[in-house]
């Protein structure tokens, strides 16, 4: 047997075994009122089957619609595609019909949005890859235009968009498919915009100075157009549900990443300009040849930051907290690393030559920028009431996570420094004490940052203990409380009365606002489609 046939047989055995286990488990657990975690397994198998069938169909289309038709194609490639399609197509059909019936009984199953997100991730990437390959071919650089990939991958994506609109995912992860599609499209849009702007700026740079390399704009323009269309379709339409944990995480991550991209490009341009002004650079034409790319990164980064930052919402929302603590973590980590690099650059004799000034200026700019980022966002976090801020999950992740990372870094660098010291004390002639600069500096900077973080953890804990622990009761009338009960302190007694409709759902942002508004007082909370209302409860 060939390797392709053997691979298909293994695939059939594995899939058949998994299906048998799933069917046996489903039959054995009896009828349940709610869908359990096992529902994820059929959807994962369905996703694998759809992916296998889709890529096999694309391979067959490429083979049949090219000028040489099937002639000259490797036999194993065609046999593997045919075998995959024969096996995957029936599995796809049967599982699709089965899960469609189960969705009518269990409409809030978590497997449906997970399946849609997997398909969107896989086939959107495949579709955008086909777009770039076709653009490269049309520009005269590619060898072959597999335009059939566009049709097949695009048809699969559009079909699942239609299925999603027909049966909208529900539950806490119902937004997952749209967020995945928005993220993939945003990456393509970002790459396309940066490449297109770099081409425009490089063209202007070459026209002014007569030198420089002009990149090919075909792929960036194609990615920008395709990414913008998909992103506008998946992200810009209004969202039915209020912001939840997933959307807050997405917004916080994208906002933080875009600002990091903009600041990093800005630091690079400032360092390049200062190096030239201070006479530490070569010819201007060669020195500024990286400016078009850095300027493109900066423009796109600021644009993305502006767009997503305005959607974080006012006040201390979950998304805004995540964004600010992510920026504080990035600033603190970069500050520790760049400070260590600056000390090493200052005291390294080999940098006394030609480019020592440019290296020092670049690292110094990084130190200043990272310090400014950390101070700015840490002060924003400190401006919020500590009693409310100390309970935020993003703050705990920042303090504990960074304390562990920087603490381990300080411990590792201290061990490295002690190894050098002990080697010298033991009389090893080749022991170079000059190598102590980096581990000692890293031990001091990371150790000081770790001490600061643990001090804040201790202050948060002591601040929580000093708060009056008077018991109080809260009665909430809503459709679903979400994580509200977990945000109240231990002395709170929370009672939930369900409305019986979907008009009073509580998301993470509203839950934090309710806890802040209650302020450790016995209260009645009414939640409807317009928000929540609060009334003081009579204490017995």
Task: List where the protein language model places each region.
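Hydrophobic/aromatic interaction determinants used to assemble and anchor large protein complexes
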Residues: 1-413, 418-478, 486-502, 513-531, ...
